[in-house]
A protein has these predicted regions:
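Bacterial N-terminal signal peptides that target proteins for export
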Residues: 1-8
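Bacterial N-terminal signal peptides
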Residues: 8-16
Length: 201
């Protein structure tokens, strides 16, 4: 009798679970009624390092799941090429543009130009000044990354070490890391920077 009661409870739970499952969100009208595939341009101002490879692969994979056609463009740190890619995406009337690693002073104007053309824009680690309505702006917490890694270095070497810094100026995440790094140098004067090296490739 106990087995039958347990089986009925289990069956009851299993049959009620579909009713508790979250119903999928409705597809936005703009997407559902779109003529042809939705075209997204992913434009990144870095080379094809491991991080970029993962970033681009993730964008393509997610786009595919949504039925989007995703095109990717890498400018290898060449600001003129990056701007050209963005302008081409605007003139080719992409439905959406994802920008990564755009720099000052040009990124804000490019984002506004795309929005004015009716293109949805999302930016990651891109220098955008002020709020632009409808634009999604995201960035990683570079100060925390710096504090964690530098803090571990200070702990491992009792606050005394000679280091080589890998850094490239001008990219928003690198600039945020540099600001945190300068503060940490004041706290740990016995950690000496012997050299700073880095290039975008």
């Amino acid at each position: 009798m106990k087995k039958i009661a347990l089986s009925l409870v289990a069956l009851g739970l299993l049959t009620s679970l579909p009713g508790l499952a979250a119903t999928p969100a409705p597809v936005p009208t703009a997407i559902a009624s779109h003529d042809g595939p939705i075209r997204i341009a992913v434009i990144r101002n870095l080379g094809s390092d491991d991080n970029t490879t993962q970033f681009v692969a993730g964008a393509i994979q997610e786009g595919k799941k949504l039925g989007f056609k995703v095109s990717t463009f890498l400018s290898n740190g060449d600001d003129a090429k990056f701007q050209d890619f963005v302008n081409q995406a605007i003139s080719q009337k992409y439905d959406g543009i994802i920008l990564s690693q755009g720099r000052d002073p040009y990124s804000t104007a490019l984002v506004k130009k795309a929005v004015d053309a009716g293109i949805k824009v999302s930016v990651f680690d891109t220098a955008v000044n002020g709020e632009i309505p409808g634009v999604t702006v995201t960035q990683q917490d570079d100060a925390s990354l710096t504090n964690l890694s530098f803090g571990q270095l200070a702990k491992d070497f009792n606050g005394k070490a000679n280091i080589v810094k890998l850094w490239v100026a001008g990219f928003p995440p690198m600039e945020r890391r540099q600001a945190a790094y300068k503060e940490l140098q004041k706290q740990y004067p016995e950690i000496k920077e012997l050299e700073s090296i880095g290039a975008v490739s």
